[in-house]
């Protein structure tokens, strides 16, 4: 398939997922007091999520589940960037959802736009280690920036991290992470632009939420550049969640032949 055909195919896929409610994000991620675990080969572990609750059936039966391995063998190169981001500071709170730590914006924190559809930034949270892998490599942390459209669609940006220098955005949140406990803490104005990607290269594919109910139809954008995070910051996130969720990454799912697009404006 040549470049123009790939671009047309991707646009068609996006149109399908942006236009029809029955494929859209119908259910939010579970909140606190979650009855699932990340312990593999257990009754409530990832392999059994679809059996815990009938509304979670797609966790086991879906064809577009996330995360996946972003392997070079599956990637198609696309030159059309097909998105813009316009973020701004807004009031935010930090919450321990039991299985992860979430920062949610209570005001207008801006948006990203994919194929003329606006997705408003709602919240971000972290998974340790990373959920997506790149050519089989799993990194130390993954940030998810969750966006929703006026029609209830979901688009998520994934940012990968490896051990190294402290992450500036997390440094500003560290006191809140350490103090959150079981209560919601006001963070004041938080600027999502401080989640710096430092690249215009990214992967994109159609997938799902990575926690129950595993709803499909999510547009995933995974940033190519791997940022750095300190061990202190990872430890703070792991100590803040409930016992048993110190590592909170869903195993890589079968891609089932899905296409993955890679955007590189320099090629």
Swiss-Prot record:
Which UniProt keywords are listed? Answer: Chloroplast, Disulfide bond, Glycoprotein, Lyase, Metal-binding, Plastid, Signal, Zinc
Q: Which GO terms describe its cellular component?
A: chloroplast stroma; chloroplast thylakoid membrane
Coiled coil regions, renumbered to chain: none
Q: Where is the active site?
A: 99
Q: Does the keyword Heme apply?
A: no
Q: Where does the signal sequence lie? A: 1-26
Where along this sequence does the record place binding of substrate? 210-211
Domain of life here? Eukaryota
- Which GO MF terms are attached to this record? carbonate dehydratase activity; zinc ion binding
EC number(s): the record gives 4.2.1.1
Residues in Alpha-carbonic anhydrase domain copies = 34-264
Pfam families documented for this protein: Carb_anhydrase
Q: Where does Zn(2+) bind?
A: 125, 127, 144
The record describes its post-translational modification as: N-glycosylated.
Positions of glycan attachment: 22, 135
User: What is the required cofactor set for this protein?
Assistant: Zn(2+)
Known catalytic reactions: hydrogencarbonate + H(+) = CO2 + H2O
- The EC category is lyase
Annotated disulfide bonds = 59-214
Compartments annotated for it: namely: Plastid, Chloroplast stroma
Q: Which InterPro entries match?
A: Alpha_CA_prokaryot-like, CA_dom, CA_dom_sf, Carbonic_anhydrase_a-class, Carbonic_anhydrase_a-class_CS
Into which family does the record put it? Answer: Belongs to the alpha-class carbonic anhydrase family.
Function in brief = Reversible hydration of carbon dioxide.
Q: What is this protein called?
A: Alpha carbonic anhydrase 4
The source organism is Arabidopsis thaliana
Gene from which this protein is expressed: ACA4
């Amino acid at each position: 398939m040549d470049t123009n055909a790939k671009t047309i195919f991707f646009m068609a896929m996006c149109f399908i997922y942006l236009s029809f409610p029955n494929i859209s994000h119908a259910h939010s991620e579970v909140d606190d007091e979650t009855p699932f675990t990340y312990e593999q080969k257990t009754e409530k572990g990832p392999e059994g999520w679809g059996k815990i609750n009938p509304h979670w059936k797609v966790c086991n039966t879906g064809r577009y589940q996330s995360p996946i391995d972003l392997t070079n063998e599956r990637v198609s190169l696309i030159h059309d960037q097909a998105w813009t981001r316009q973020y701004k500071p807004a009031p935010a709170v930090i919450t321990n959802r039991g299985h992860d730590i979430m920062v949610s914006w209570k005001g207008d924190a801006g948006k990203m736009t994919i194929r003329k559809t606006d997705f408003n930034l709602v919240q971000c949270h972290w998974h340790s280690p990373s959920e997506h892998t790149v050519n089989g490599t799993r990194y130390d942390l993954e940030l998810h920036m969750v966006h929703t459209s006026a029609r209830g669609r979901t688009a998520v940006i994934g940012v990968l991290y490896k051990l190294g220098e402290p992450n500036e955005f997390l440094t500003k949140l560290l006191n809140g992470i350490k103090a959150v406990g079981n209560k919601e803490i006001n963070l004041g104005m938080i600027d999502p632009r401080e989640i710096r990607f430092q690249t215009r290269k990214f992967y994109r594919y159609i997938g799902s939420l990575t926690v129950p109910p595993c709803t499909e139809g999510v547009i995933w954008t995974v940033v190519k550049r791997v940022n750095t995070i300190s061990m202190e910051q990872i430890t703070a996130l792991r100590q803040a969640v409930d016992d048993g969720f110190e590592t909170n990454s869903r195993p890589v799912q079968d891609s089932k032949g899905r296409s993955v697009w890679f955007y590189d404006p320099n090629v």
